[in-house]
């Protein structure tokens, strides 16, 4: 009997926690554009630098491949 009540209590607690989380997400949506951290560059800059680096490496390796095969 105590085990059943404990199980029901756990199920109710989990259900309430899930509903509370969903309610807070709907009521207070996260800001899609958070204020930038002044100590780090914005993510776009870091991603662009990374992609540009890969692009340069890729182009130079293709150039070396064509140059060596000719």
From Swiss-Prot:
Membrane topology listed for this record: Single-pass membrane protein
Transmembrane helix among keywords: yes
InterPro entries for this protein: Chordopox_A13L
TM annotation in the entry: 2-22
Region called Disordered, residue ranges: 27-49
The keyword Transmembrane helix is assigned to this record: yes
Domain of life: Viruses
Keywords assigned: Late protein, Membrane, Transmembrane, Transmembrane helix, Virion
Residue intervals annotated with topology Virion surface: 23-68
Post-translational modification: Phosphorylated by a OPG054-independent mechanism.
Biased composition, class Pro residues, residue ranges: 31-44
Sequence similarity: Belongs to the orthopoxvirus OPG139 family.
Function: Essential for the encapsidation of DNA into immature virions (IV) and the subsequent maturation of IV into mature virions (MV).
Protein name, entry field: Virion membrane protein OPG139
Name of the gene this protein is made from: OPG139
């Amino acid at each position: 009997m105590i085990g059943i009540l404990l199980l029901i209590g756990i199920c109710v607690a989990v259900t309430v926690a899930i509903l509370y989380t969903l309610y807070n997400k709907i009521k207070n949506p996260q800001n899609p554009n958070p204020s930038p951290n002044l100590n780090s560059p914005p993510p776009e800059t870091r991603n662009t630098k990374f992609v540009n680096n890969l692009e340069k490496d890729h182009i130079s390796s293709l150039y070396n491949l064509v140059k060596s095969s000719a």
